[in-house]
From Swiss-Prot:
This is Large ribosomal subunit protein bL20. One of its GO terms (biological process) is ribosomal large subunit assembly. It comes from Kocuria rhizophila (strain ATCC 9341 / DSM 348 / NBRC 103217 / DC2201). One of its GO terms (cellular component) is ribonucleoprotein complex. PROSITE patterns: RIBOSOMAL_L20. Keywords: Ribonucleoprotein, Ribosomal protein, RNA-binding, rRNA-binding. One of its GO terms (molecular function) is structural constituent of ribosome. NCBIfam families: rplT_bact. Belongs to the bacterial ribosomal protein bL20 family. Binds directly to 23S ribosomal RNA and is necessary for the in vitro assembly process of the 50S ribosomal subunit. It is not involved in the protein synthesizing functions of that subunit. SUPFAM superfamilies: Ribosomal protein L20. InterPro entries: Ribosomal_bL20, RIBOSOMAL_L20_CS, Ribosomal_protein_bL20_C. It comes from the Bacteria.
Length: 128
């Protein structure tokens, strides 16, 4: 049986890892073992942050919608409640885009939400 030499494959593998780790500081960009460990951690961070990004954007959209709806005299909660009552199916991403880019259209949506909201007949809340 022929002898298998693995030097070429080993060097190629190590070179690829070190190239991927080229932007890291210190030993993490120069030593193979440290670079490999850091690459494994970085893959985990990337995976987790791709999922975290979705929540981050949702929070940003809600903040933008809340600010714009308060400027039009309605809180975020009541605005969303009014849109659901009016059966308007616009997602938060589009609402946030309207709030930033087209204030007149957003104001029209706020008016639709206000019209669809039931009148609050309960007694006003008092601090207990």
């Amino acid at each position: 049986m022929a002898r298998v030499k693995r030097a070429v494959n080993a060097h190629k593998k190590r070179r690829e890892v070190l190239e991927k780790a080229s932007g890291y500081r210190g030993q993490r960009s120069r030593l193979y073992r440290k670079a490999k460990e850091q690459m494994l951690h970085s893959y985990t961070y990337s995976y987790n942050d791709r999922r975290k990004k979705k929540g981050d954007f949702r929070r940003l959209w809600i903040q933008r919608i809340n600010a714009a709806s308060r400027a039009n005299g309605l809180t975020y909660n009541r605005f969303i409640q009014g849109l659901k009552a009016a059966e308007v199916e616009v997602d938060r991403r589009m609402l946030a885009e309207l709030a930033v880019s087209d204030e007149n259209a957003f104001a029209a949506l706020v008016q639709v939400a206000k019209d669809a909201l039931p009148e609050d007949t309960s007694a006003p809340r008092t601090a207990a």
